[in-house]
Structures are given as C-alpha cells and as structure tokens.
Amino acid sequence: MSKKFTMTLLSSSLAGLLVMSGGVSAQEEKYTVPYAIGEGKWGNTYEVVKTGGNGNFRYEVKEKNGKKRSLFTFDSKGDVIINGSGITYTIHDGALNDFAQTAEKKKNGQSQSHRMTDSVVRDVYNKVYSLQRTKITGFSVEDGENGKVSLGSDAKASGEFSVAVGNGAKATEKASTSVGSWSAALGRQSVALGVGTYAYANASTAAGTAAYVDGSAIYGTAIGNYAKVDKNATEGVALGAKAISAHKNSVALGANSRTTRDNEVYIGYEEASGKAYKTRTLGGLTDGTRPSDAATVRQVDRVKDSVEQLAQDTNTRLVVEAKKSREYTDSRTTVGVNPDGKLTRAEGATKTIAVNDGLVALSGRTDRIDYAVGSVDRRVTKNTQAIQSNTRQLQEHNARLNSQQRQIRENHEEMKRAAAQSAALAGLFQPYSVGKFNATAALGGYSDKQAVAVGVGYRFNEQTAAKAGIAASDGDVSYNMGVNFEF
C-alpha cells in the first residue's frame, strides 16, 4: 500500500500535523484523522483516542458518528494484535508507528507531522475485519521486518524468517523451515519435512518420516523414512529408507545402505543387523575412459580374451621347447673303448667319454639335459594352474558386472518414474483467492513413463499461501508441501 499521502491542516500549509478534535481538550488526547486527498479538508470520519495507563498506552481508532464504534487499537510500535477464531495475527504498519511517535512528541510540546490518513485507517481495518473471520486453529503470523509463520497446535517459529507448519512443529533458527507434525528445524537455514523429522545442523535437510540429521553434521542431507546422517558426518548424504551416512563427505545410496569410510559412495545394504552386507548391481554404465572411471563387463571381457589368447600362445611355445629338449636325450654316439677304459673312437661326437671301473664321465655335462626338461615341465604346470585361476577370477568379475548392469537398468527406470512424478507435481496450481481452498490434478511424463498428481491448497491472505500434493507412477509415490510468502 502506498504511504505517499498529501495532508494539509485546515488553515495551514503544514502537512500532516496532529489536530485535536473540536471541543476536546488536549489532556484527553483525542486526535482527528485527516483525509488523504483534497486541499484544506480534514475528515470527520475517524478519530484516535489514547487509552491505558501506567506506561502501557494504546491508541484506539473510532468512527466519529453517533455510535462511536471502535475499529481497532494499536500500540506505540504501530502493531495491531488480532485475537479471534483461534487466530493470533500481528499487523505492522509504518504509518501507525509514525502516528504514535508523533503523538508523544506533540504531548511534549513539539509540533510534528505524521502519515496516518483516513485511507490508512480503512486499509488496516479491512485486514483486521478479514482476519477476525478466518477460522484456522493454531495459526500465528508475525508480519514485519523479521516475519515468522507458524501453523498448527503448539507450532513454534521463533527464528527470523522461520516457518513452522504442523502440530508441535518447531523452527528456531534464522531462515529455518519445519513442515510436518512434531518436526524440528533447529539449525540456521535448515529444512525438516515430514512427521517426526529433525534437522539439527546448520544448512541441513531432512525429508521423510523420522529422517534425522545430527547437529554436528553441517550440510548433511537425509532423504527417506528413517534416513540418518550421523554424528560428525559433515556433508554426508543418506538417500533411501533407513539409509545411514556415518562418515564425512560420504553417500549411502539405497534402502538400508550404510557408509563404511570417508569420501565413499556405498550402495551395499544390511539385510539384518549384525549380518554381512549384501551387494547391489550398478547398471547402465558407459565404458570407462579415465583412470578413475568404473570398468564395464565389456571392457573386462576384452581383457579376458587377451589373457586367454596369451595363455594359449605361451602353452604352445612351452610344449614345443619341451619336445625339443627331449629329442636331445634320444640322440646316440657310438664309441670304442680299450680294456684299460680309454676311448678309441667317438663317431660324430663333440663331447668325449671316459670309462674307468664302471664310471662314465661326459665332458660338457650334457647328462643334465633330462633334469632341465623335468624342470621345464614343472614350470609349464604352474603356469597352466595360474592361467586357470585367472580365468575363474575373470568369470567372477563378469558375473558381478552383469549384476551391476541389471541394477543400473532398474535405477534408470526408477529415475524416469521420479522425473514423471516431478513433472506432474509441477503442474499443480497454487491457490489464488484469499480464504479459499483449491483442489487440482495434473498429469506428467518423462520418456516412456507417466505419472498423475493431485493436490490441495489454501490462501490465508494476500501474502501467505500453502499447498500440498502427491504423485504416483507404477507403484512409486512422491509428495511435496510448501508455504509461500510475499513481501
């Protein structure tokens, strides 16, 4: 509302001076409210009477007709407190505050101007009249520089620009938002959404029934029923029912998942307390191109084929070399020996043999060939066993990667359903008419998935509205709730 009014005294060019009502002494402190428009015209419609005592003064605005009907009262800060139909509402108006301060200065003999006119009175009265007839139990709004909004039995919004919606909901720090019965947003800029949800840390977010972010887990995010970001898990993320992020900068992805170390994304889950963690399949991956990228089954299969071919080539070469070694042992050299054991001839031999008392000496020690061949056979056997072990390991990796591909495909389908639900929720309309509920439905889609959403809303006044919606797609359900403030 515009506060730029031109006010003139009956016979003066001074703007907005306080004027006593005709026939009333200054000690009674009754003041006439001027017209907002018109030169040299002072209104006969409204008057302001100062009431109260012992330092607790208030100003009562009345009609100046025979009925003297009281319209509203305001204090020295320009605040109008309304109590009616289960509502507590505070309206702050700068012109009312200006009038109260001017009246105090005039009482002390100072000539001062003010900004309250008949149009200001009518505007404030219209707000009061409308709010007195609004029937919402447990609704409280503080309208002013540090506006706070609470809606629901025992709901409390005590921080600057805070919002608490739901029975027992609490938003205690600056810019905190708590939506849901018994929810609590106790950190600066924290958000708690859901029944029994707690966001204790600064800049934390908790969404889902009994979702929880510890007070030491700054920037923590817990989404899902009973999801939790535990003590000192700064920047931790728990996504999924009963998921727990217990380490710094770590992500627990999926129902019952729990992180095991800092800087980790963990998708395994605990089927029962105290038992070993089970695994999930991560599917839909492209082939890795960087050292930090995950490898796909396709890439591992190529490595497996290369290893198997290498093993086959190595085995062939070892068999050939072994056969060559055995052929040397089959060669013969005919020799002649005298009775004294001396060699007489050795046909085609490059080595010589001496026989003495049944002992044979072969120069060059070619008698070690058979031993060398046996050693080669043992090495070939060990290599074959190692290759078989590597083949089994590759088969196990292949099975795990196949499982990951299936999981990625399932995640992709779930993401498309979530996108369709988001599109449907975005199509729900916000209420526009003050004091009226609205019901709306919308259809959304993404790729080959569709979702339907329904929602309701209510506009409390021109500045405040709330709405909630729910969307469903192939058995999956998502929801949202929101409160809108206009300043």
Swiss-Prot record:
Belongs to the autotransporter-2 (AT-2) (TC 1.B.40) family. Eib subfamily. Residues 27-436 are extracellular. Homotrimer; can probably form mixed heterotrimers in vivo. In denaturing gels runs as a band of about 180 kDa. Residues 394-436 are annotated as: Outer membrane translocation of the passenger domain. This is Immunoglobulin-binding protein EibE. Keywords: Cell outer membrane, Coiled coil, Membrane, Protein transport, Signal, Transmembrane, Transmembrane beta strand, Transport. GO terms for cellular component: cell outer membrane; cell surface. Residues 1-26 form the signal peptide. Residues 379-422 form a coiled coil.
